């Protein structure tokens, strides 16, 4: 098998550009934001670039101040960055919001069939009796990440 050759400086510069572009986007507390910020948090975990974590923290704090939406499966995607923020800052507010998402998923989220989480984009029940692959990321993987905190 051939050795993987890469330019670390170029990769980190590319990550910087992606992070900067992402942070210029006007995103709300929903699936796109949750997935994007999860990516930035993962970039932080790999590079240890504190700026990435601070950018996510500042934006999440701003969104918290503006007010949290009603929970849906889609809005639970933001839980991933909340877990990362709690892990690295120790600030309980992030954990408390994540726990409220867990409670929603366990007790209130719409389900069908054999207790399968239903894909919900809004409170209008847009996709009755549907489970999507991204539901696994937004809800299933999130629940796995919170096990040691709940």
Could you tell me what each predicted segment is?
Residues 150:
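Conserved small/polar residues in nucleotide/adenosyl-binding loops
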Residues 4-6:
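N-terminal amphipathic/basic leader segments beginning at the initiator methionine
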Residues 29-44, 71-87, 131-147:
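Well-ordered alpha-helical segments within folded domains of soluble proteins
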Residues 9-27, 51-70, 96-116:
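Long, well-ordered core segments of solenoidal/helical folds
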């Amino acid at each position: 098998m051939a050795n993987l050759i890469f330019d670390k400086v170029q990769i980190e510069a590319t990550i910087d550009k992606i992070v900067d572009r992402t942070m210029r986007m006007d995103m709300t507390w929903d699936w796109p934001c949750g997935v994007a910020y999860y990516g930035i948090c993962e970039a932080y975990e790999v590079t240890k670039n504190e700026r990435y974590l601070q950018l996510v923290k500042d934006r999440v704090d701003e969104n918290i101040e503006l007010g949290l939406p009603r929970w849906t499966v889609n809005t639970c995607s933001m839980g991933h960055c909340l877990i990362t923020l709690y892990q690295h800052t120790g600030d309980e507010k992030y954990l408390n919001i994540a726990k409220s998402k867990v409670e929603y998923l366990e007790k209130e989220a719409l389900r069908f069939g054999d207790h399968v989480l239903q894909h919900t984009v809004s409170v209008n029940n847009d996709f009755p009796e549907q489970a999507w692959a991204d539901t696994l990321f937004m809800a299933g993987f999130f629940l796995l990440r919170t096990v040691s905190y709940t």
